[in-house]
């Protein structure tokens, strides 16, 4: 019936095993893309730190980009090595360790983004928001440290994948609302799409958490998710260039 057909599509049971040529092409495309991504965000981050001057907002944004790129490199570099050599199943430990580290650095990324919001819109109080951000980040990191995640194996439990991402998604939702409201209230054209980049990143990430283990093709959604983060970083970089141009 229709429900059984949908189940087969989601789980990938109707898919033929990938041919060697397809696997090689996937390895090349992913590796080239990952190198481009890491070089881009790290370069932009370093340039923002160096070019920010006394502007704390853009220095934080640059640090945020460096944390993003450095953290993701722990996962993407071993992934590229695995795809180009013996395959993902033989790199369980370095890949798992990389995901573990990335789960923490991504949390730090959103905490830094919260402080970018405070600096950009000159928020002086709102201690309740700060407490909420730190609480969600702390819960997320504690959950990521639990041995039940089985990071260093090929099969991490789905239940724990969902559990550790609940506070992460709530943190992301909070940041989305803050940037959406503030950009609209302040008619901030430079940051008017910041909220959308975060929506897109989570929109592509959630299906990967839920279904990538049963259908590896869903893992390809990490590419548009990564593009959304590049957009986030470029919004900050372009805003810095525009403001520096006005001041010169």
Locate each region found by the language model.
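Hydrophobic transmembrane alpha-helical segments in integral membrane proteins
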Residues: 23-41
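Alpha-helical transmembrane segments in multipass membrane proteins, preferentially the mid-helix core
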Residues: 41-49, 112-117, 145-147, 167-189, ...
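Internal transmembrane alpha-helix with an interfacial aromatic "cap," most often the third helix
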Residues: 45-49, 74-91, 96-130, 236
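Membrane-interface helix-boundary motifs at transmembrane edges
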Residues: 50-59, 118-129, 181-191, 245
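Hydrophobic alpha-helical membrane segments
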Residues: 71, 170-174, 192-208
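Juxtamembrane "helix-exit" motif on the non-cytosolic side of transmembrane helices
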Residues: 81-84, 144-154, 206-214
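Non-cytosolic membrane-interface motifs at loop->transmembrane helix junctions
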Residues: 88-99, 153-165, 216-224
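Membrane-proximal helix-loop-helix units in multi-pass membrane proteins
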Residues: 104-174
